[in-house]
Amino acid sequence: MESRQRFLRGFLWMSLGMALFFTAEFALEWHGAGHPGAELLSWTGNNNAKLVDLMSPMARAYNNVLAMLIATIGLAIPLTANMHTPKLIDMFLRDRTNQIMLGACAIGAAHVLWSAWLVGPGFAPMWAIRLSVFGTLLGWAALIPYFFYVVRFLDPSNILRRLRADVVEAIDLVQRGKLDPEEAQNIIHERMHQTGTIVIKSIDRADRSVALEGIWGLKLILQDYGERKALMPAAWFKVDRRDFVGASQEALQVINEERNWFELRVMTQFFLAYQGALARSTDAIPAISDATRVVAALAVRRGDREAYVVATRFFHNYLREAIKRKDVHALFDLFYQYRTLASDLLDRPEELHALGQRFRYYAEQATAQGLTFAQQMAGYDLGWVALEAAAAASPSAPLVLSEMIALNHNGTHGPRMLLIKAKIVVGAGLIERKRGDLAQLVADNLADLPADLLAQAVAELSAVRERAFWEVTDRQVNVEWMAPEHRACLAPFAGLLGLG
């Protein structure tokens, strides 16, 4: 991994720098002393007690290194684990670099003491002493790079990358037949819980960058898995109650039949994060809905209907939660992502019609909760889907249009002007697309409205020339704005409305 490579590079450069400096220092001293021979450079055979004196500070140096490492790790790891995930401690201890460094320092410290004990009046274990000296130097050379490695290890971005790498590796090993599917499932369940915990805690602390990285990482996991799913063994798709605690027997049966436990597990983390984001981090909401939409679109493109169905079910859960919380901003974003998904369904009339039905259903649910503005905005998005279906000559175009015009434009406190305008925009767009038969259906739907009200709506739509809305929004485009060629069709549609 990148952190490990940085550690190795730092260690090599530090070792090289120390070697060059110490060698140059020795060469200068040796030259200044008149090039003394080997017998004058060593205490061996002359005064072995000096060798013990030499190794005593080395033992203390090792103790200092170990003390610094243990103090740093003992403080930093638990504190960071408390912020992100308790499993961080286990991750740290399982990391190969940490195991090697801590083990090498402990063995090196013990070896210095062992070498010092071996020294006797007539015996000098020179290879053991040399190993102790060079081991001490290498330990100090590794100290600073390893400190940086530990700090990077605790970076939540790196933690998320490690978790994602573990999941991808487990999938790859199962695909190649080198890991039992049940064992891989256990690994993945644990890694998913850890990732979800980091994302949720980041949202709670308003740590937006980490939350967004976690969401993005989950999306990448699903993308990678989607490319491998067809190659996974049959045993991979079998799960039991232990894997989904709380699920009914019927639910488990559906999961096994649809072979979508992995998507369900990952996207459950999306949903839990979404629930937290509704109250604390509004900028995480578009990231979650966009990731879900991308997952659904990719599933459609590779012909994985089961994965598509799971993604859309979670979309509906998001909509339900937003309606319950009466969060218009979240609904505004979800409706946009939902309509964008329709672009990948134009050659799938049944799925496109189902999307239109759900659009209408949740728009009406929003109205029932008093969110009439959300329902009217849904009219624009559902109308956009109807126009795209008509342009693609989709067999479902009339069905999607019927869902759009079925939205009630007559409210308890009077006509809903925004929805009326949305229907007029759709009617004009259908004329532009040479679908006068469908435009007539829209006109018939608006026939219960007074002519002066319809004329006012047409006039206001004609007057909109600025494409961008006058406030900063996620979409930025004014929903009432119409392209010139589209606006030119307002007059013919007004004729269908009987406005002359």
Task: Enumerate the language-model features and the residues they cover.
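Membrane-interfacial helical/loop segments at transmembrane boundaries in membrane proteins
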Residues: P36-G45
